[in-house]
């Protein structure tokens, strides 16, 4: 339904800023390498019940801050209950709907630009 790229990274426990580690993961995973700059990364640290959702510049410019806050609310609601999978599924569905509005799928031109697998970070480097 969308040409946007959604990725998930699950990280082991670590101390420090989840956002700064997520930003490094965003770069490491090539999230800025998409033609339309429309990648979204869900960075999850289950042991801390923490997450960060990052979007590349074009999706951010089109959806605004309210969208990111709504995704965070969905994740937070479920994470507080330990429902990591359910929260992530709901947030990814919402992200996909918004991506489809702004970056619709075109079978003639769409290329899967990033891997579809979940990233499991084995170590965190500061």
Across the structure, where does each feature detected by a protein language model lie?
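Divalent-cation
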Residues: 1-125
